Amino acid sequence: FNILIMNKIVVWSLIASLAGFLFGFDTVVISGADKKLQELWNSSDAFHGTVVMGMALWGTVFGAIFGGIPANKIGRKNTLIWIGVLFFFSAIGSALANDPIVFAIFRFVGGLGVGASTIAAPAYISEIAPAKDRGKLVAFYQFNIVLGILIAFLSNYLLRNAGENSWRWMMGVQAIPSLIYTLFIFTIPKSPRWLLSKSRNEEAKKVLASMGQLADFEAIKREIEHDNTSAVTNDTIFSKKYRTPLLLA
């Protein structure tokens, strides 16, 4: 396998996995603003916990459940772009919010990005990676979640003495990696498997050629056609047979 081609795939995988960095950062960054926000808005413990602090988690749940819809409809790459947009506006909106409801709405938006990223990023990486390297490359996403958590704690520590509006800086700083991530996503190719699933064969061939996998075109096409045929069913995640594992999850 050509080392230059493999290097390209590694770079594309790293770029897509940066969604995990934003996941980790977004999840933890609120911790630095926790007490400041409750004091600022004089919120009750129940309201502060379930709305101000908890709204991002509700967004994550919805994003994870429904994130597969845009990933399949508009593609993995376009979904990853929109995830970056969600994170960016969530950071700016949260930083500029002057009341808890507006703050919670923008945190919910960020949560949607978190949830959707758990679907789109691993799917994209697994679809561009050679089978033998798939596990290693998808692991970039998990690594970046942990890295994002670490950097968020460090960022909060460095901004803790930034005055009475330190919480705004803590929340707003996420806009920087969100913008960088979004711009980088524009440089990666679309998933060849998604292109084939939409019968965009010529585009898929070009991407596979750039990845040194053009010889696999027919095999991948047959595999996707088989999967599409097998997928014709009325079962959904909410079907009776999935109810127990869904509740446990």
Segments (PLM) and residue ranges:
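Transmembrane-helix signature of 12-pass secondary carriers
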Residues: N2-A249
